[in-house]
Amino acid sequence: MAKRSKGRPVDGILLLNKPIGISSNKALQQTKGVYFAQKAGHTGALDPLATGMLPICFGEATKFTQFLLDTDKTYVVRAKLGERTTTSDSDGEIVSTKDVNVTREQLIKEIAAFVGESDQYPSMYSALKYQGRPLYKYAREGIEVPRKCRKINVFSLTFDEFDEVNNVIQMTAHVSKGTYIRTIVDDLGEKLGCGAHVVMLHRTAVGQYPAEKMVSLDEIEALLAKAKDEEVAPSTYLDALLLPLDTALVDLPVVEISKEQGSIFSHGQAIDLDIDLPEGAIKVVADGIFIGTGERNASGHLKVKRGLASQQDDYVKPE
């Protein structure tokens, strides 16, 4: 007999505003527990020091997490000049202290130089794995292991403000996936000749998702209390916070098909649409309803890439 999943079936995406001081995985587990969800995953870890947007994918949405992992991100970062640390943030030990003798003009010039494509080595204090073990675990043992250089793209890095009394600068960064803001700050400190480390990092956007859609754990707890006071199911308020699955796929081309074609597609059969399909993943909509992603097969027909099990129940299997 198959083992029954604990929890209830929940499908959708929650834009959690992760608080400071907890790991992304702990935030995920707390949220999954509150929703009593059978299945959940996050898309793109934030350090315990960092706050901000952490998309939590429930149920069928977990099939499309890669699209959010691959998308660009936006951050607001504050950096302390004059101090370099082992981790490039305030969680690490200070390894050097220098006087800060920089002007706003110098800051603006050096910050602007980071815009564009470049190579970046991941920090040893990151969750990337080497031989199945996170890099930060090696770093804590004083072991440095080889890391592959990554191509990154800084779409924009703007100077926001400079607190000259405390030697703290604030910047806004719009970057490609896999970009380490701590590394950018550390490199900036070296260019300025004084060292620097991150003291605040807040992710304001993941792809097209805006900051206004974020929900905090405190807000979720307040809704739970409201549901209890009104003697209604928590899902009455919690599920209203979830975004549709296909909001993770806004950058994909869309193919619209009929309900009959959707029935064929949802049961794993390829469809000849008699059109020139684009390369790569395609968002498939049947009779106005999102039913999964597809791709072009060798014959030029539309085949299933990732289908939705929930949609199979809505269709009768074709003869």
From Swiss-Prot:
Family: Belongs to the pseudouridine synthase TruB family. Type 1 subfamily.
UniProt xrefs under Gene3D superfamilies: Pseudouridine synthase, PUA domain
NCBIfam families on file: TruB
Organism: Pseudoalteromonas translucida (strain TAC 125)
PANTHER family given in the database record: PSEUDOURIDYLATE SYNTHASE TRUB1, TRNA-PSEUDOURIDINE SYNTHASE
Name of the protein in question: tRNA pseudouridine synthase B
GO biological process, one term: mRNA pseudouridine synthesis
Catalytic activity: uridine(55) in tRNA = pseudouridine(55) in tRNA
Entry's EC annotation: 5.4.99.25
Function summary: Responsible for synthesis of pseudouridine from uracil-55 in the psi GC loop of transfer RNAs.
Keywords: Isomerase, tRNA processing
Gene: truB
InterPro entries (alphabetical): PsdUridine_synth_cat_dom_sf (IPR020103), PsdUridine_synth_N (IPR002501), PUA_sf (IPR036974), tRNA_psdUridine_synth_TruB (IPR014780), tRNA_sdUridine_synth_fam1_C (IPR015240), TruB_C (IPR032819)
The UniProt record lists the keyword Translocase: no
Enzyme superclass (EC): isomerase
Active site: D47
Matches recorded under HAMAP family: TruB_bact
GO molecular function term, any single one: tRNA pseudouridine(55) synthase activity
Domain of life of the organism encoding this protein: Bacteria
